[in-house]
């Protein structure tokens, strides 16, 4: 006779504490089987078998497994398509319900619709919860119920809504007795799923209060090791709780909280305007820009050999570590799009492959902001001057010296394009294209 259970499906919520869907699952009478699926539909698209994100996920799963073993349970880790895995699980267990947390990306919505239909046909309930953002979908809207497309009024409404609702807690860690009891199950190795374990070290998942306190003064200085929190990857995969982080930010730093509001804003945009996740400009007129798309110039940008030290430092940091400081992300993105007139989608895809903290909503939002094609984006005539940005945010060249030690040597390349010439060119190209559309 099959055992009657509930299932919690971990995805972007790799933690046992303050987990909304897990809390709901553990609040019933049936034991909860925790599962994770290495989705081959996603893994097969990753060309780099040293992918840091897969290694990060694997490390997070190992940590959860050790916590579960201590309470007599075990994480069940599968490799395959979610559809195939759930067909197996339906045969293995008598499942009353499956619980998981919302995901707002186009692929995830299609996947979850297919799984919901499969489970429904087997008489199994499928419950999803809000967990990776504070406010989602249409929870913060204009007075007429339509989604905001400008950040400042959205942020004001977001804060007002937070004052009314507060931030809920879902203490799933207090209900651990409801986990299904079983002997420890083996964890698949990275090698067994086709990836290489390089023993990567990852940023701490502990929010540093000193970083938050001085965030407004320090956040734009790329040479400061503690100028930013480095929590992006933990928010991406849910190894920390965005609710707990927002609670600390609200009490400590309005500027830090504002970054979490930007994160909610871009997730809201992706959900309500899914075209942006399919490579379309938010502002359709900008799809008419005649990009130069010079492959040799794109290669130099990718490799950090543009002749602009601040741009090259950012790209080299990204290639070496999977991280790039946010101020430098804006500078490098602006340079690719505005100085080189290379399609923002090329840069978006490169960042998507390299960033440890890659998040579709935020990455797309950032690139469309730089290209001026996004909602509430920088105006097209705003072209970052890399030299002035360096003078303002790395005046002693500490960041540049770390990543481009040869920047003052004769071997360092000359700027691949003169700023004033590039600025004049992009303004003419944008102006002409937008007038025609």
Give, region by region, the residue ranges found by the protein language model.
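Trp/Phe/Arg-rich N-terminal binding region typifying the photolyase-homology
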Residues: 1-162, 252, 316, 428-433, ...
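Short alpha-helical segments used as structural interaction elements across diverse proteins
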Residues: 8, 324-326, 420
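Alpha-helical packing segments of well-folded alpha/beta enzyme cores
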Residues: 21, 60, 64, 208, ...
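Active-site-proximal binding-pocket segments
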Residues: 124, 224-401
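Hydrophobic alpha-helical segments, especially transmembrane helices
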Residues: 12, 112-113, 264, 328-330, ...
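Charge-dense, low-complexity intrinsically disordered segments
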Residues: 47, 51-55, 202, 301, ...
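Glycine/tryptophan-enriched, flexible segments
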Residues: 124, 145-286, 389-437
């Amino acid at each position: 006779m099959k055992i009657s259970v509930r299932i919690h499906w971990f995805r972007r919520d790799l933690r046992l504490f303050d987990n909304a869907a897990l809390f709901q699952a553990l609040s019933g009478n049936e034991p909860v089987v925790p599962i994770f699926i290495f989705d081959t539909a996603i893994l097969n698209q990753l060309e780099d078998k040293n992918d840091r994100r897969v290694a990060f996920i694997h490390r997070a799963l190992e940590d959860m497994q050790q916590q579960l073993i201590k309470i007599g349970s075990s994480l069940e880790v599968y490799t395959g398509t979610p559809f195939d895995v759930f067909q197996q699980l339906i045969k293995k267990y008598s499942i009353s319900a499956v619980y998981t947390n919302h995901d707002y990306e186009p692929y995830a919505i299609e996947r979850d619709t297919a799984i919901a239909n499969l489970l429904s046909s087997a008489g199994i309930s499928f419950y999803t919860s809000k967990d990776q953002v504070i406010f989602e979908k249409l929870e913060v809207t204009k007075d007429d119920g339509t989604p905001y497309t400008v950040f400042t009024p959205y942020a004001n409404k977001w804060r007002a809504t937070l004052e009314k609702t507060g931030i809920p807690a879902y203490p799933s860690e207090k209900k651990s007795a409801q986990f299904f009891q079983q002997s420890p199950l083996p964890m698949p190795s990275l090698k067994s799923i086709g990836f290489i374990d390089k023993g990567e070290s990852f940023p701490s998942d502990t929010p540093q209060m000193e970083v938050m306190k001085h965030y407004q003064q320090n956040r734009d200085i790329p040479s400061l090791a503690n100028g930013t929190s480095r929590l992006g990857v933990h928010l991406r995969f849910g190894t920390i709780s965005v609710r707990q982080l927002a609670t600390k930010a609200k009490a400590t730093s309005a500027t830090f909280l504002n970054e979490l509001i930007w994160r909610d804003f871009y997730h809201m945009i992706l959900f309500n305007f899914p075209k942006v996740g399919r490579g379309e400009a938010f502002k359709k007129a900008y799809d008419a820009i005649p990009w130069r798309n010079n492959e040799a110039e794109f290669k130099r940008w990718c490799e950090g050999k543009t002749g602009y030290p601040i741009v090259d430092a950012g790209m080299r940091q990204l290639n070496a570590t999977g991280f790039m400081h946010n101020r430098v992300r804006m500078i490098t993105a602006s340079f690719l799009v505005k100085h080189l007139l290379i399609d923002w989608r090329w840069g978006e895809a490169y960042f998507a492959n390299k960033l440890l903290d890659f998040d579709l909503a935020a990455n797309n939002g950032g690139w469309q902001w730089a290209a001026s094609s996004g909602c509430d984006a920088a105006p097209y005539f705003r072209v970052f001057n890399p030299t002035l940005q360096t003078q303002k945010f790395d005046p002693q060249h500490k960041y540049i010296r770390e990543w481009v030690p040869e920047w003052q040597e004769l071997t360092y390349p000359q700027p691949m394009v003169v700023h004033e010439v590039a600025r004049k060119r992009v303004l003419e190209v944008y102006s002409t294209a937008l007038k025609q559309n």
